[in-house]
UniProtKB/Swiss-Prot annotation:
Membrane-spanning ranges: 6-26, 71-91, 103-123, 154-174, 199-219, 260-280
Protein name: Glucose import system permease protein GlcT
Domain of life assignment: Archaea
Subunit note: The complex is composed of two ATP-binding proteins (GlcV), two transmembrane proteins (GlcT and GlcU) and a solute-binding protein (GlcS).
Organism: Saccharolobus solfataricus (strain ATCC 35092 / DSM 1617 / JCM 11322 / P2) (Sulfolobus solfataricus)
Membrane topology of this protein: Multi-pass membrane protein
Amino acid sequence: MMKKGTIILVAPTAIFSAILLYLVIWNAVMSFMNWSLLNSKPTFVGLETYSIVIRTFQFTNSLLHSIELSVILVVIGNILGIFIAALLYFLNSNKARSTFLSIVIYPLSISMAVNGLIWLWLFNIHIGVDWLLVRIGLPQFPWLSSTSTMFPSLVLVSVWAYTGIAALFYLAGFMNIDKTIVEAARLDGTSAFKILYKILIPNSLNSFIIATALLFLFSFRIFDLPYVLSGGTTNIFLQTSELYMYYLFTVEYFSQATAVATMITLIATIIIIPYALTVIRRWIRR
């Protein structure tokens, strides 16, 4: 029999999972219906709604932005995460390591909406980075005022906000490696860089899998940062699939909104499940 303490811990998770699963299934079912708040009897239309959504420019544009952002953040986030974790790992002072780690994960301790507001102020031409550039004799940079730099600015903010996740998992992986191996390499005169790519990185596959999965999920389903930076949902240069879904709800295109939500969930699930299964298999083998 299950212990009482185990039941108390498992029950809330099971209830939450059941509610979440119900909502996902309900959303998927409603995506095959033509419905609105004024229509008490939704009518079945099959894949017609999906066909309409897929043919729209906004959907393909927003989905492309989500995919591009995911790929860029996964690549840059992992690279920066590894090097930040390595710098923290090779610090001799635990106090210094804790201080710098707090700085790295600071963006994760506040909401993404607040992160977006901070960068919105930094991009302000009167009080932000551009003001400083002018003061030192450099030209201003059109962070959010040019269509060609809006998306790169979103990428910059996203990398700053989420790289700490990767760094945290890589540092945990590095710290879990047998220190005698690292010390032996140091005694042999091996440089820190060689220790990193010959010992630390090869033994941190679990960290890579988890960091990649989380970076993908956060970037593919990003909402707060582009919403704050663009000031709404209709800026096509910063519109992600989540923003487009929210926009459809605000204009009461509920059938199309549920279809977009279902496709977002399906894409994320298809990509994440193999990662989850890989991690589970590795833990079972251990």
